Amino acid sequence: MKIRHWSALSLFVLPALAQAEALTGEVHRQPLNIQAIVMFLLFVGGTLYITYWASKRTRSRQDYYTAGGRITGFQNGLAIAGDYMSAASFLGISALVYASGYDGLIYSIGFLIGWPIILFLIAERLRNLGRYTFADVASYRLQQRPIRTLSACGSLVVVALYLIAQMVGAGKLIQLLFGLNYHVAVVLVGILMVLYVLFGGMLATTWVQIIKAVMLLSGATFMAIMVMKSVNFNFNTLFSEAVKVHPKGLSIMSPGGLVSDPISALSLGLALMFGTAGLPHILMRFFTVSDAKEARKSVFYATGFIGYFYILTFIIGFGAILLVGPNQTFKDAAGALLGGNNMAAVHLANAVGGSFFLGFISAVAFATILAVVAGLTLAGASAVSHDLYASVIKKGKANERDELRVSKITVIILGIVAIGLGILFENQNIAFMVGLAFSIAASCNFPIIIISMYWDKLTTRGAMIGGWLGLSTAVILMILGPTIWVTILGHEKPIYPYEYPALFSMIAAFVGTWFFSITDNSETGKQERLLFKSQFVRSQTGLGASKGGAH
């Protein structure tokens, strides 16, 4: 019974722990892989050409932020999948399956938990009410300046933390796969992400994400097919043979006790489940399609692609047990896997496709990072230029040219900051950074979006107090928790005993928003409640919503 209890809880512990598997600990530098370098250069050359092509078609603010709303639902679904599937999760989940078997499947399923929330509760209404950023939705019937300031701050904190995790992950992965120096790798990723976003905007970012998704799905599909071919496409054979060669034997086919602390597990689970629906770079993608119908299609396709991908990682993990585990070519003198368990999928690529396919998978891992950081950079730049500069500082009176200039300056600044933080945080725990980013998205962005769309009694006062309460509670509890208070600051015991704060910070955000809204008897508050009806009609019908260009 206890095992079932822990396995149910571990269902919620999603990408962060899997990423920890992939990218924490000592990195074993690999020899220079010429095929990987060539394929990576081909990818970079191709995507830079796409950026040049996109720059010729990016003339207005709408083009820059949303690709003119001309992306189809299918294309956007692929791009969202490309934005969401990280290299760390690919290597991490494969490594987890390789080491623990069935437990890896729990993590794979966990990645999908947040997507039904976006599909059923958010996608259509977000597209009907917003134009460029989710702050357009949150501030639809509330006071523009305070709500946009809150939304932009929430976005920038999430983007900064997620960028740190991606840049550190980029450096470690490239050092691992290509044999390049960590600092060189971080600078290279920073320069490329700035080029994509600065010149190509959302159009270039979208196509980089689509190409990356196709490459990753194709590579993973080929690996899974080759694994299944080796067992005559029989799952019983795959699992029974894996049990025979794995050191843990039959226990890899049953759930284990991966989670030791139920409160931390539940807290991280809530963060990753609801945080997905508060990630600015994911939400921004819904404005790239023409209408709410295409937005709904986007999530439908994205969920399918992401779910399919994580099924493949499970097969890849078991394939690694079968084809990599017993093969001494992939082991060091001590009998451990070269590069650690996180290299299981990469070694499997070598086992099923030789050095050429190994080079392809290595290049795909790099492409994956570039796609994610490009999306994050654009989301951060739009929060500064559209929400802070145009709406707060200029009070909605900024012209397009000035707003775009501010956005592009922000892209350059974000690139420099990302490189600096990537180098500064080289030895920090990536899982912790990702968990914090999701915790803040779930504690600040998600409550404001969902309540503003569904609750007619929300007022600016309630949204502001609840949002800032959620944001500050998440940050304060994280600082007082074991990772920062003990590991980084060197105190003996943490004041807040759990790893992640979302269980408490989300409650603080929702309760604060509810209480300070229902006790708001001001004239402004009454007017904001009356405006809900017209907002509801537009959110359901799309009447008056901005339309994208023709496909």
Curated annotation (Swiss-Prot):
Gene Ontology molecular functions: acetate transmembrane transporter activity; glycolate transmembrane transporter activity; symporter activity
Chief localisation class: membrane
Pfam families, per the entry: SSF
GO BP annotations, alphabetical order: plasma membrane acetate transport; sodium ion transport
Tagged with keyword Ion transport: yes
Membrane topology per record: Multi-pass membrane protein
InterPro entries the record matches: Cation/Ac_symporter_ActP (IPR014083), Na/Glc_symporter_sf (IPR038377), Na/solute_symporter (IPR001734), Na/solute_symporter_CS (IPR018212), Sodium:Solute_Symporter (IPR050277)
Entry's transmembrane regions: 5-25, 34-54, 77-97, 104-124, 150-170, 184-204, 207-227, 263-283, 304-324, 356-376, 406-426, 430-450, 469-489, 498-518
Superkingdom, natural source: Bacteria
Protein's job: Transports acetate.
Family classification: Belongs to the sodium:solute symporter (SSF) (TC 2.A.21) family.
Protein name per the record: Cation/acetate symporter ActP
Organism: Yersinia pestis (strain Pestoides F)
